[in-house]
Amino acid sequence: MEQAGSQPERYERASYDYGHYDVARLHRSPIISRFIGSWKAQALAARNGCPTVLYSIDVINRTLLGVMLAAAAGAATVNWPSFRGPEAGGVADGKVATSWNADPGAGALRNIRWKTAIPGLAHSSPAIWENRLFVTSAISSAGPAPLKVGLYGDGDPADDNAEQSWVVYCLEKNTGKILWQRVAHKGAPKTKRHTKATHANSTPATDGKRLIAYLGSEGVYAYDLDGNLLWTKDLGVFDPGPQGYDLQWGTASSPVLFEDKLILQCDQKKNSFLVVLSAKDGKELWRVGRDGVSNHSWATPAVITAAGRTQIVCNGWPYIAGYELATGKELWRLKSGGDIPVPTPVFADGLIYVTNAHGGPKPLYAVKPDASGDITPDAASNTSPGLAWYEPSNGAYMQTPVILDDLLYSCSDRGVLKVYDARTGQLRYTERLGAGTTGFSSSPIAVDSKLYFASEEGEVYVIKAGAQFELLSKNLLGEIAMASPAVSENALYYRTRGHVVAIAER
């Protein structure tokens, strides 16, 4: 690698001959597109005089050639290590079923590999490493816990305060067999939850060496992949709820593992903080306060390497912010708008996309990875040097957007899908999924130029990627679906109200 200010070897177009490989198809690989996006961001930063580290074209060619060979062989995504999969992008390589039925009341089951019952109530999504699938659940001693889904504005907490058992499950991915289960914590909940939430909202994370279960006020638990407890960490009791109201809605931010570091965004009414722990032993590496930056948030942070630096990007209110991974130093901030931040920031094609849409403003931002300082758009021009573009009024409340082939797909909690040019912010089309009578909370995923959107009632809409709307199918899960799906080796894995369901062509 060349340091900033030195002479790189070459940065012109690569002269390598990749032969008969379909380069257009290879570029659609999320692995390749993320790599190319990071490279472009670094090159742009260098051209603008920003401190950065650039890869030489020879290094890039060698890396791309290796990735292209794997992609050309038809390799499918195997590991889905945390919320929304590799790099939190919600995009996978391979091919998955586009038509199925998991509802026995609607006829014969179709393209269902297995369906395993999971006791209790949770919105945590599956995390997958090789042939192991992990989920968490909260099992109430008072029996089935109440859950109210749909479109409503009631903010009162749920009546679900009896003793709970927080359980971590490991399933065999190919069969659905439960390999092991561990009770991480047992006791009365230390905080209340929203009527649409659960006491186990956070998706576990794994790096193949350890599994992290984050249970909010009930602590952090690290296991090896055989279920042996490695360490625990108590981060205190949180007060998660909207600012200015005597309400508690529970926590929902999921843990992120990156290079033996565990990153946790812990936002609440007072004393919000971002903390990085050693994934090996739970030792605190650094902590930075976020009071005044974010008074509450239910979003999962994203780790982004681009423009010569690695940063943690946190959705929040009143500010979205980026932090230096090594130290916790704030790099930039952006006045958000939506006062109940939920979506995760996403990095694709050299830009950071982030949205929040509860309350009055509903912004959608495309942030430059070399942003610095306060990059809030100027009120008169709606522009900022730190933004590539900015859409002030059509962001998403619950769902995290998906970026695929230079298009950004953003779905509202009422099922209104808006598709933008990811580079310019130009609106390509608007279309409603469903009849507008059900909520959409699960974040979508993209596989093989198709996108999958699940309603809270368990209806999954499959659309063709592109600048024009084309509905390919509508499929049934047979239960309430709030969690976001996982993808591994050409199969879909949905967490529903009472099951984990594996969907694959049969």
Residue spans of the language-model regions?
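N-terminal targeting/docking segments
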Residues: Y21, R28-W39, C50-S56, S140, ...
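Compositionally biased, low-structure terminal segments
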Residues: H27, I32-I36, D58, D246, ...
